[in-house]
C-alpha cells in the first residue's frame, strides 16, 4: 500500500465529512458564540486580542461562514436554477452565461441542468431544484404541460420561461420572434429570384420549429408561391436525417434552388451537403454560428441574440424576486437578417 506523505504546506489537514462550526471556533478560541459571530460578520464590540484569537482559530480549523444559513434567515437561499435543452449546444452557452452574470450581480448562485429535450427529465430537474429551495427558475421548456409547477409558483418560486412558451401555465416568457425572422429570411430568398425554396428544421412539436415553419409558409404565400410538401422536412437534427433530406431536395428533376434551415445545427449539416454539389444552392439559416462568415460562400443568417434572451429573462426573474406583482409578461425580441453571400446567390437555372 502506498504511503501518503504530509503536504508540508503548513495549512490545516483536510477534514472530510463534518465541517467545522462556529461552536468549534468558539471552543478553540475560548470565547462565546456571539463573539465568533461578531468577528465573522465584521461587527464591532470585540477587542483586538480577542479578534486575533478568533481569527487564529478560524484559520487553524479551516472554518467557512455558512452563507446558506445566513440567506435562509432572510427568506432566500441565494440560488436560482436554469434548465436548458442542452448545455453543450452553442446557442445556449451565451444564454447561460448571461443568466449567470445577472445572478452574480444580484448575489445569487446559478445551478444549471440539461433536459435533453425530454419532458420527464425537465420535470425531474425542475422539481429537484425546487426541493433545494432555489429562489427562482429560468426554464427552456421541453414539455407541453407545466401544470406540475403550479404549487411551486403558489409557494413563491419565481419562474420565467425562455425561448419557448410554457404549456397550460400562466408565467413570464421571453422569446425570439421566430415567425417574423423566418418570414424575413424566406422573403430575402424570394427577393433574389427564388421560387422553389425548401425548409429543413427541427421537430414540429417544438414551438420554435413550428413558428419558423409558419413564417416560411407565410413568406411563400406573400409571394403567391406554391409549397410542395416534399420541400418541407422537419424532424430530429441528427446529421444523417438532415443530410438525407437536403440531398433529396437539391437533386432530382425539379430540385429546389434555395434552402431555409431552422437552426444552427441543421445549417452546419446542410453546408456540408451543399459543398459537395456541382451547382450552387442559395441558403439562409436561422441562428448565427461560429465561422459562418468565413465559409465559401459566407452563410447568410437570421440572427437572434441568445445573450439578450438570457439577460432579459434573468432581469425579469429578479424583478419578481424583488416584489414586482404585475400579471405575467410576454417579451418578444426581434431578429436581424445578416446578408453574407449564400442567401444572395441567384437561382442556378435562371428561373
Residue ranges and their predicted role:
Residues 116-119, 140-145, 264-265:
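Short beta->alpha connector loops
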Residues 63-128, 132-136, 213-217:
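Amphipathic helical "hinge" segments at domain boundaries
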Residues 111-113, 138-139, 199, 303:
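Short catalytic-loop micro-motif centered on adjacent basic/acidic residues
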Residues 28, 33-38, 72-88, 188, ...:
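Short beta-strand segments enriched in small/hydrophobic residues
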Residues 136-149, 161-170:
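Acidic, Gly/Pro-rich loop/turn segments at junctions of secondary structure
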Residues 1-78:
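N-terminal helix-turn-helix DNA-binding module of bacterial transcription factors
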Residues 69, 123-126, 149, 186, ...:
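Short hydrophobic/charged patches on amphipathic alpha-helices used for structural packing
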Residues 1-15, 60, 101-106, 154-161, ...:
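Bacterial carbohydrate/catabolite-sensing allosteric modules
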